[in-house]
Amino acid sequence: IEECVGTNEHTLNEMVAFCKAKKWKPLFVIPPMSSKLQRKFSDEFVEKVLLSVVNKSSRLNNIPLYNYLKQEDFCYDYKLYCDGGFKLNKYGSKKFMRHFLGDLIKDGIIANNSVLSVDKL
């Protein structure tokens, strides 16, 4: 697992460097996962393989992180998924994007305007 984590960290750092070179402002988004699927992974595994790498890069590079992994609006509503918990279906995606765009507007990352509006989703 250590090698995998190191590879993930290296790849993420390359992606961040690429964005910075292009003058882009990246942000990290961890999408929701159903509670049934979450039970398949220990908290220690999720922390070590995913969260520690993303949290570290977010902190070191001052990149906003939106972690919806255990978002209750999504975790227990299994009809939002098309595959049991990893992939949101059409309705789940629409609900997630409304929530996510609302957070981006609330945090001042994007403006709520007529071109990009939560209400249009």
Segments predicted by a language model, with ranges:
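Generic intrinsically disordered, low-complexity segments enriched for polar/acidic and small residues
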Residues: 63-65, 78, 93
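Noncatalytic linker/hinge segments flanking ATPase motor cores
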Residues: 67-74, 106-112
